[in-house]
Amino acid sequence: MIEVSLFGIVLGLIPITLAGLFVTAYLQYRRGDQLDF
C-alpha cells in the first residue's frame, strides 16, 4: 500500500504548495517592484 500512502501525501502537499505560492505572489504584489530579499 505504498502507492496509496504516496498518493495521500501528494494530495496533502498540493494545497499547501499552492497556498504557499499564492501567499508569496500576493506579498510580492503588495510590495510592488521591491525585490530585495
From Swiss-Prot:
Main location (coarse class): plastid
Family assignment from sequence similarity: Belongs to the PetG family.
Keywords: Chloroplast, Electron transport, Membrane, Photosynthesis, Plastid, Thylakoid, Transmembrane, Transmembrane helix, Transport
Keyword Zinc appears in the UniProt entry: no
Function: Component of the cytochrome b6-f complex, which mediates electron transfer between photosystem II (PSII) and photosystem I (PSI), cyclic electron flow around PSI, and state transitions. PetG is required for either the stability or assembly of the cytochrome b6-f complex.
Complex formation: The 4 large subunits of the cytochrome b6-f complex are cytochrome b6, subunit IV (17 kDa polypeptide, PetD), cytochrome f and the Rieske protein, while the 4 small subunits are PetG, PetL, PetM and PetN. The complex functions as a dimer.
Subcellular location: Plastid, Chloroplast thylakoid membrane
Recorded topology in the membrane: Single-pass membrane protein
Protein name per Swiss-Prot or TrEMBL: Cytochrome b6-f complex subunit 5
Transmembrane segments: 5-25
GO cellular component: chloroplast thylakoid membrane; cytochrome b6f complex
Keyword Acyltransferase among record annotations: no
Organism: Arabis hirsuta
Domain of life: Eukaryota
HAMAP family: Cytb6_f_PetG
One GO term of the biological process aspect: cytochrome complex assembly
GO terms for MF: electron transporter, transferring electrons within cytochrome b6/f complex of photosystem II activity
